[in-house]
Amino acid sequence: MKERSTELVEGFRHSVPYINAHRGKTFVIMLGGEAIAHENFTNIINDIGLLHSLGIRLVVVYGARPQIEQNLADHHYEPVYHKHTRVTDNKTLELVKQSAGLLQLDITARLSMNLNNTPLQGANINVVSGNFIIAQPLGVDDGVDYCHSGKIRRIDEHAINRQLDNGAIVLIGPVAVSVTGESFNLAFEDVATQLAIKLQAEKLIGFCSTQGVQDKDGKILSEVFLNQAPELIKELEVKGDYYSGTVCFLRSAIKACRRGVRRSHLLSYQADGSLLQELFSRDGIGTQIVMESAEQIRRANINDIGGILELIRPLEQQGILVRRSREQLEREIDKFIIIERDNLTIACAALYPYPEEKIGEMACLAVNPKYRSSLRGEVLLNRIAEHAKQLGLEKLFVLTTRSIHWFQERGFEPAELSMLPIQKQVLYNYQRRSKILMLNLEPQPGFT
């Protein structure tokens, strides 16, 4: 008898909303030369093929920096840089074209073949390259001529979209031609960024040697806001990581995010399956750079009742929360705030004000177990406290049987039953014997 894999079933169920959400969207994928040279590149290619089979419009932009460096070394030619940008003279240009051309052929071959020995065996993938980008020279800076190092003059987004509409993967490298027929060496990060902006891509995806951006303790930051990214870049540059994949990608993500690309993702090219885990799971595996959080804290409405019930039922069964019926929730839904992540309610809390006594009760604080290691409970507490102050309340109380220390660590102090509003005193459950804790609220401007 075959064994059932519940993990596979659950994983597939959780991925379905993302499959539907991503279908028909445009993703720009940045593949640096380091990623292409790594042994895991075959798996990345297979996963790119899988994305294509799911109806995602893909533009793959590749770089060749380490391959160019090796080619220069093999020809005993010393690379020249000015302000961290390669000076591409005639000899260097020939070697750049050689390296980039070989990679284009290799990537095209890998994407075009039938992907034997993979779940996509027999799939037909068309890969298209062309003169979609017109370049121009960087020119002269501080007396240094960049020669054939260039930048983008314009992008033919209509031609690219035609190919994407026809079901092709568009492959673009770091060499482009000018209106005069000259070839120029471009920074592939700039190419990917400008393409994502011009194509109004849903996502810009990059790869580096680590699984995203790390904090000072070495932990992966699952989310970085746009206003945080510049400081992270400075910290990495101080360490001498000017050319690291992380720094280059962060620079690109900032530009893309400011120009309308909703999310940028940074993943490890060393970890098998990182691309799929990032795109088809709620929490991902790398770092995403966003204008605003993927999570939303807001007032609950009648459509949120199902999600709240699903969140609080386990806690009610354990006796941690007082049981609430659907009918009660419907009557009191305006008292609740929730934290929502990708249409899933992951945390909730309620405020029951007693205006005459200038006091309020914080109740039904619940956080999904997968998200309890973060500060979401504290975020809800702060939001409830702010709302209470806006209502002119001076105190906030809770009744709790299990979270006494958590509230005390946040300023709550033991209180007597007689300190509660009369209505609450009458309803106090002597069988539960909940502890009463109270917090003095700082006065909100406008209230005395």
Swiss-Prot record:
- Any idea which GO molecular function terms this record carries? L-glutamate N-acetyltransferase activity
Pathway linked to the protein: Amino-acid biosynthesis; L-arginine biosynthesis; N(2)-acetyl-L-ornithine from L-glutamate: step 1/4
Record's Gene Ontology CC terms? cytoplasm
N-acetyltransferase domain: from which residue to which, for each copy?
A: 295-433
Q: What class of enzyme is it?
A: transferase
Record's keyword terms, sorted = Acyltransferase, Amino-acid biosynthesis, Arginine biosynthesis, Cytoplasm, Transferase
**InterPro entries reported for this sequence:** AceGlu_kinase-like_sf, Acyl_CoA_acyltransferase, Asp/Glu/Uridylate_kinase, GNAT_dom, NAGS_kin, NH2A_AcTrfase
- Catalytic reaction equation(s): L-glutamate + acetyl-CoA = N-acetyl-L-glutamate + CoA + H(+)
Q: Does the keyword Amino-acid biosynthesis apply?
A: yes
Name the Enzyme Commission number(s) assigned to this protein: 2.3.1.1
Q: Where in the cell is it found?
A: Cytoplasm
Principal place where this protein is found? cytoplasm
Task: State any GO BP term from the record.
Answer: L-arginine biosynthetic process
An example Pfam family from this entry, by short name, is: AA_kinase
Family the entry assigns: Belongs to the acetyltransferase family. ArgA subfamily.
The record's subunit annotation is:
Homohexamer.
Q: Please state what the protein is called.
A: Amino-acid acetyltransferase
Instruction: Give the species this sequence originates from.
Output: Photorhabdus laumondii subsp. laumondii (strain DSM 15139 / CIP 105565 / TT01) (Photorhabdus luminescens subsp. laumondii)
